[in-house]
Amino acid sequence: MKRVREENETLHLENARRSPPLASTHFLGFPCISLFYSQHKSTKKNIYLDLKTKKKELLPMVFALRAFKIFLKLFYQHILLNLSTLITTFSLFLLYIVVTPLMIGFSKDFLCHFHLGLIWICLLFSFLPERFFQNDFEDGTLELYYLSGYCLQKILLSKLYGHWVLQISGVFCSFPVLQLLYQFDQSKMNWFTIIIGSQIFTLMCGIHSCLALGITSNGWNSLQNLTTLPTLLPLIVFCTSIETEWFHVILLMGYLLLFLFFYPILVSITLQTLLAK
């Protein structure tokens, strides 16, 4: 009996050595532990694959948020560095709208009928003299933007819109004085057209500035007149007639979308050839 017991113990030890504990059907009184281990391993693998696919799906969103964060940083930095633009735009626009009635008279009939044309001409004169990106080009900031690997068009667009916010804030601050002189109703349509039209003016200035970056200051005025006149006339017609016809609102929005479409193309062509030199 003792010999039989020893033989059974040795056989049991040999079987335990040959097969791993998790692969046995009965181990420490728990049956089918290998099935539980395989199920746990498969669920862990599925969770890993799900996380991997979700990470791939979220990558474009992460890059978009990072680009938007850079856009806001440049936008905010441009506003902080150019707060003097708010004062200059406010003073220029206020000077134009005060001097014009002094020259043509304070007739209520004339000012009520032609106030939109006068406002848009004053707005144009306060927006157009700017030379965007000239200081950035001279001190090498544009080259750093170009070599950074980020989208140069978006960087310049953020700087343009930062400048637009400062300018349009100066214009809106002078509206109470404008109301006293011209005596017109401040309708929502006037605010809407000024916001859209001023964006078009800013995009026009940005395109002209990019085209004239390599030109000296002597040839800037002639180039500005040649490039702005063809794009200026339809915009002035739309903005002055927008009080009577709603169809011109759609044309004005289409004009804005047209400039938003052509802006990155023209900027990329001009700046890449200029900075490559």
Curated annotation (Swiss-Prot):
Protein topology in the membrane: Multi-pass membrane protein
Localization: Mitochondrion membrane
GO biological process, any: cytochrome complex assembly
InterPro entries, per database record: Cyt_c_biogenesis_CcmB
Keyword Protein biosynthesis part of the UniProt annotation: no
Keyword Transmembrane helix annotated: yes
UniProt xrefs under Pfam families: CcmB (PF03379)
GO CC annotations, alphabetized: mitochondrial membrane
Keywords assigned by UniProt, alphabetized: Cytochrome c-type biogenesis, Membrane, Mitochondrion, Transmembrane, Transmembrane helix, Transport
Transmembrane segments: 61-81, 110-130, 164-184, 194-214, 227-247, 249-269
Gene Ontology molecular functions: heme transmembrane transporter activity
Role description: May be involved in the export of heme to the mitochondrion for the biogenesis of c-type cytochromes.
UniProt record similarity statement: Belongs to the CcmB/CycW/HelB family.
Name the UniProt record assigns to this protein: Putative cytochrome c biogenesis ccmB-like mitochondrial protein
Source species of the chain: Marchantia polymorpha
Originating gene: CCMB
